[in-house]
């Protein structure tokens, strides 16, 4: 009996969930969506928050580096705004027509009888539009998005100080050691707290999950919480990445064991399409 139990445990798949970032992961950076998004963020900061245009590039870089997203950083340093208005302005004007259906990726995803979940810092509407444009809207069990981690009742109405913290000036000082940066009410990657919370909400076991993301910071955080990590968009493997793929189409090349187990069980779905061969570092 004990032998049978051990045998059954050995037959269990190594992974039972695939967790995917959305932007610049399920579609390539070359689409230009990220560039347009950065422009819209800058326009929002100038038009809606009254920030001088000349100060926006440096401010964006500092906020992104220290808070994960510019939005999270803006809230931290004292700007109060409606999250829906921000997302509508930043994402609502994106050229989604640049995204095209990806039948190769669709077949790769559908060929595996395993949980597949999207985890994005973006809002729900944006995620739905992207997945629909890619033809992947029915390939995932669910989407963990901005609203999942930041429900309106928890932080949208949180008031911040009327005084704006000058974070640019803070980092221009020769010695900022010991001076703590203001905290943000926004939960988002690469915060370990946010990522752990997301996994709890989705009932995902990090030890049995493969995490795909184009951000090296997110990959490092994913590794810290026990995820098996795959950096997407480059073949250069960075610290914290178990694998590195130039293209998401190379999932099978990086993790052949997923398909091998499915093929042995007879549950894999075959297609006449062949995935592109690009570089992978493991």
Indicate residue ranges for each PLM-predicted region.
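Short phosphate-binding/catalytic loops that engage adenosine nucleotides
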Residues: 79, 114, 227
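Internal catalytic-core helix/loop-beta-alpha segment
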Residues: 103, 108-117
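N-terminal helical cap/lid subdomain that shapes the substrate entry/recognition surface
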Residues: 2-20, 25-106, 123-128
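Conserved G/P- and acidic residue-centered "switch" motifs that form tight phosphate/ATP-binding loops
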Residues: 25, 120, 214
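Short, surface-exposed alpha-helical recognition segments that flank or form part
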Residues: 32, 96-100, 118, 182-190
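Asp-based, Mg2+/Mn2+-dependent phosphohydrolase catalytic module
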Residues: 1-15, 110, 123-282
